[in-house]
Amino acid sequence: MKVSGQIIRKKMLASMLLFFLASLVVNSHAESSRIETLKKGHLPAQVAARKALEDSLYYRFEPWFELFENRIQSLTKAPETVENLLELMTFHFAYAGMLGEVSHTLAFTSRYKLDSVAQPFSYYSQKAKETAKILLEKDGLTDLQKAKAYLYLGGAEGYISIFDYGQGDLLSAIVNGFQADGHLEQALQLNPDQIEAHFGLGMYRYGNSRFGGVSNFLMQGGRDLRLKGLNHIEEAIRLNSSSSPLAYKTLIWFNIAEQINPDNADLESSDPLFPARRRERAIELLAQFKARYFSGPIRKDFIGNKEFYMMSALQATLDGRYGEGKKEFEKVLEICEFLKNEKQMAINPQLISSVQAGIKFCDLMLLDPSVNDEIGIRSACLKIGEQLDFLEGGGAMLEYDSRKIRHELQNIFFKALKETSAKFNC
């Protein structure tokens, strides 16, 4: 199940600015020491999982895959004690989680995935689930041990639900999702300190309410649990859970999704889901996300996080800040090219097409030919027409698996282009 060599290729920087030379030498030594520590497997599973998720923001996967593989092999051969099973379960789940982050980096959708990532993701999710069930059959477990087992059982079922949904197995996805919700609740009831459960519950409850359709009707009685879901994820961030890197990304996306949700159009300004309030929170979260993870010293082989810039680009574009939006989209494109060329990552071509469409959209919205500039107006109308054709033909500015979200975004951008077209009398 080794996938790391297929995903990441280490490459030293060709040149360094003289001003930073001394500090880079020190950092290089510290990084080497850290990698050696990882290889020796000195980190407990929960600590390793937390550090690995943070490193995933910088596309640093390889040392963690190696560590997880080594620890899983060692623990599989060890006596089947409760403590060993807890560690093994956590490493299985952490491995699946890192593969999930690889799939996000490559921009997997139901139409684009690599078996070299998707199959191990399913495998390690199943192994985490199996190990959790073995644990729960043990006699004499403490409430804390039971809570941990239910936490990872629910988390693994959530992963399996996501995988099965992508494979088109809706029934299995619904069943595993329902089980995940119940088991995460059990984890919190047994031990409220299992704060990671908040992230899983938030994803499940918001996601089912916002995107679920039939599954929301079956699993949640059709109830609108969007706000409850958002609050769970807020709690995961407030309590500084290990899942905070994922919680930030998810919560920002969900807040963007609420701004374009037509169900919110007639809400009172005092309603927590009022679009302007969701916009304000999205901007706050983007600033916090940047300050917490992307404002430190320059990192080797890292030029930026494409998810952060993609969210920033969309928010700026929704706000009508098209110059900023274009700049952020261009940064996403730069990062995609870097990941493809320098790290040999197979980025979904549709993501790149969507980003290019975003850049074109911003360019069009920035056009401002004078009333007497007939050539400029004709040129603008031609470009606007091409972009309208792109959107009408199924093109997307965001490669998102939810048809509902794609449709809502298309409507917003299509409407803006139509208004610009009318302004120029195209």
Range-by-range predicted roles:
Residues 1-9:
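N-terminal secretory signal peptides that target proteins for export/translocation
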Residues 36-40, 44, 48-70, 88-193, ...:
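Short coil/linker segments at helix-helix boundaries
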Residues 81, 146, 194, 242-244, ...:
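Residue-level recognition of tetratricopeptide repeat
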Residues 350, 357, 361-426:
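Terminal, low-structured helical/coil segments at or just beyond the last alpha-helical repeat
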